[in-house]
Design a protein with these regions (language model features):
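Juxtamembrane extramembrane loops of integral membrane proteins
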Residues: 6-228, 232-239, 253, 258
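Amphipathic alpha-helical surface "interface" segments used
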Residues: 178-186, 293-303, 463-478
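Low-complexity, flexible helical/coil segments
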Residues: 94-100, 131-136, 211-214, 256-261, ...
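Extracellular ligand-binding/catalytic regions of CAZymes and related secreted enzymes
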Residues: 2-59, 163, 167-173, 281, ...
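A general marker of short, structured functional hotspots
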Residues: 82, 237, 308-310, 478, ...
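Extended, charge-rich low-complexity interaction segments
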Residues: 121-144, 312-327, 484-485, 492
Length: 514
């Protein structure tokens, strides 16, 4: 008996010892099973290549207060895991250390580095207290420094670190131009969009109305939501910039829609003939889609006025993306605001190649001619019979000048291999119309694509987002509704009958044996 007890204690001690050793090993080694569809928690090839190409040592100082409550306590481990991965691929050129800012001197050091304290609520002995904590990262490279003051959003952690490393190790930023002079949207006034793009690029306004050439050091040019007609002098500068190998994004509103007036009017931008020369066009129509966002409207009933949410087909929530293009392949959804269809049927005849980036859903349609925009309008199946209307596209190849054989004569009549992006909505990136993170990522990915920075696209597009719900028919909705009402009682009754029959059978079996 005593021997058996000793053996049991020895086995328990051995198991505990093995568990302790495994725990120590798991802390020192980074190894995670990533079951997310987009491998959100796995370091991307772009990040691996970036740190693998470092030519000098980068030092990272992680200022993290220990013993913080949930959910902040998981942030430290997440940062530790990902820094271990970066270090493994950096070929000895990346080192990190964790610092717990304690006392006045420790906090002063963190704040001098640009790490601001955050207020964290802590429950201590049934009392709610506020504790100062630090959750920041400092990166040092040669005589340069980048700071991530607060790390809270773990889903974008890799992008935050990799983009900071890119800024830290890149000597000069590429210039991205955005046109002015025709009522275009001012990207510097779009707070979120400006922050997302300006962190990696030098954003430069350029007034096309002056008729001056687009500077050659502008890597890509954005034409965002112009309101007035382009004269030939402005079109000439766009054309010649493209002929010199420049890249352009045309983000255009072909219909000026006013929800308050419930009407819309076509907009003549004067760009249609030039875009057709480039194999594409934005049609003067509005795309409606069953897969759409809700809007708030005022309704009257019984003498009362109240606000309600109604689905509005002219704000499509697009999720039909080109799975082979890095701009959109990892996005979940984009909210468009009065979007027009894009036509690229003329590209093939000009020797150009196209890729449709975004399409409408399987149940969509278009409004043309006289535009009536009524949130309460009922649509027939025929109104929503189109499948996959193109909403954004790329045209690439060697373009022919729109001004060849015209006045003023083209200095350059054909371009080297280059590309343009065309989107039938010029508002999707504005602060008022950002439906979700997908809109911002879409615009930033377009800029990266035109500026030849595909690496950041793949990192940024990784996110833990919920895809839009699949649309179901009214008949399926009714079936699910009644199944939800009737199904549970039927299951309970069936289970009761099953138990009752088992008891009866068991009782009969006992009586038979007796």
């Amino acid at each position: 008996m005593k021997k058996h007890k000793t053996q049991t204690i020895a086995r328990i001690a051995l198991i505990l010892g093995i568990l302790v050793v495994l725990n120590i090993i798991s802390i020192r080694l980074f190894g995670r099973l990533d079951l997310t569809s987009q491998k959100v928690y796995t370091l991307s090839d772009a990040s691996k290549n970036m740190v693998g190409a470092l030519d000098d040592r980068v030092t990272l100082k992680a200022y993290f207060t220990e013993d913080l409550p949930a959910p902040y306590n998981s942030n430290r481990r997440a940062v530790l895991d990902i820094l271990n991965e970066y270090k493994a691929y950096a070929k000895g050129n990346l080192q990190y250390e964790f610092i717990n800012p304690q006392g006045e001197k420790g906090e002063q050091d963190a704040q001098q580095q640009g790490i601001a304290p955050v207020q964290v609520q802590v429950v201590n002995e049934d009392k709610l207290e506020v504790k100062r904590g630090y959750l920041g990262l400092v990166m040092l490279y040669e005589d340069r420094k980048e700071v991530l003051p607060v790390i809270q959003n773990l889903s974008s952690l890799e992008y935050d670190i990799s983009s900071a490393l890119k800024r830290l190790t890149t000597r000069t930023k590429k210039k991205i131009g955005y046109t002015t002079g025709h009522g275009e949207a001012d990207i510097s006034a779009m707070r979120q969009t400006y922050q997302a793009v300006s962190s990696q690029y030098d954003l430069t306004p350029f007034d096309l109305s002056k008729g001056e050439p687009v500077p050659s050091d502008i890597a890509a040019l954005l034409v965002i939501s112009p309101q007035s007609r382009f004269q030939d002098s402005a079109k000439y500068q766009l054309d010649q910039y493209l002929m010199r190998g420049g890249r352009i994004a045309f983000l255009l509103n072909r219909v000026n829609a006013n929800l308050q007036m419930r009407m819309g009017q076509p907009v003549d931008l004067g760009l249609e003939d030039m875009l057709q020369q480039y194999g594409t066009r934005v049609n003067p129509d509005l795309v409606r889609d069953v897969q759409c966002a809700n809007i708030s409207v005022l309704q009257q009933q019984g003498g009362f006025t109240f606000q309600s949410q109604v689905p509005f087909p002219y704000i499509p929530v697009a999720s039909n993306f080109n799975a082979n293009n890095p701009i959109v392949k990892d996005l979940q959804s984009i909210f468009f605001h009065f979007v027009s269809s894009v036509d690229t049927s003329g590209a093939a005849g000009k020797g150009l190649k196209t890729e449709v980036l975004v399409r409408s859903s399987k149940r969509s349609g278009r409004q043309t001619g006289f535009f009536l925009i009524d949130p309460f309008q009922r649509y027939t199946p025929a109104d929503l019979a189109e499948d996959g209307i193109p909403l954004a596209a790329i045209v690439h190849g060697s373009f022919k000048s729109f001004f060849e054989g015209k006045q003023p004569p083209a200095l350059v009549t054909s371009s080297p291999e280059t590309r343009i992006v065309v989107v039938g909505d010029g508002d999707f990136m504005k602060d008022d119309f950002l439906g979700n993170r997908g809109n911002l990522t879409f615009l930033a990915n377009i800029v990266d694509y035109l500026a030849d920075d595909a690496g950041l696209i793949t990192i940024r597009s990784k996110n833990v987002a919920t895809p839009p719900l699949e649309q179901v028919s009214d008949g399926t909705k009714r079936l699910l509704k009644y199944a939800d009402l009737i199904g549970p009682p039927i299951l309970i009754v069936a289970y009761g009958l099953f138990r009752w029959r088992r008891r009866v059978a068991f009782k009969k079996a006992i009586e038979a044996q007796g």
